């Protein structure tokens, strides 16, 4: 259907192109000779043969005098104590030191533990931006297949998986076909099965 509309509009354009403005068909000229075409007024130069505004020459950058200064601080190499406390190892940090953020008077503090608290605080902003986490995928899977546990097999009282129905999936089990969530933004079905 779309192709026929496209073809019809193309034929209409060809028919309109064949007609001139006063309704007469366009006379095709002889192939040997073409009529002279006058230049557009925008393409005409001044009588001197130069453009009306002077074009400045290109400026060449001199790199032989040294590299340009950049605002990016260099890589900071800081000593890092191991949790055992005996040896000191060097590590490279790509982030600027604490004096760059809060001034030279700020004391340097290393995290007391190298475990989850140091990494969780640093990765919290990225975790907050993540929309499709592991928990969301699990919830979505339970909403899509609420009768997943009905099949035989697996451990425990049900079958299939070892998880119990919780939250929205448990509420949706008794409703039948109405009110099931269709997607993650909260649209629910109002139609039957």
Swiss-Prot record:
Modified residues (Pyrrolidone carboxylic acid): 28, 65
Pfam families linked: ANP
Entry's localization field: Secreted
Descriptive protein name: Bradykinin-potentiating and C-type natriuretic peptides
Sequence ranges of Basic and acidic residues compositional bias: 125-150
Composition bias type Low complexity, residue spans: 95-123
Tissues where this protein is expressed: Expressed by the venom gland.
Cellular component annotations (GO), alphabetically ordered: extracellular region
Its biological purpose: Bradykinin-potentiating peptide both inhibits the activity of the angiotensin-converting enzyme (ACE) and enhances the action of bradykinin by inhibiting the peptidases that inactivate it. It acts as an indirect hypotensive agent. Neither synthetic Tf1, nor synthetic Tf2 show bradykinin-potentiating effects.
Lineage: Eukaryota, Metazoa, Chordata, Craniata, Vertebrata
Kinase is among the record's keywords: no
Biased composition (Gly residues): 152-162
Record keyword Hydrolase present: no
Prosegment location in residue numbers: 24-27, 40-43, 58-64, 75-169
PANTHER family, A to Z: C-TYPE NATRIURETIC PEPTIDE (PTHR12167:SF2)
Signal sequence region: 1-23
Disordered, as annotated region: 25-173
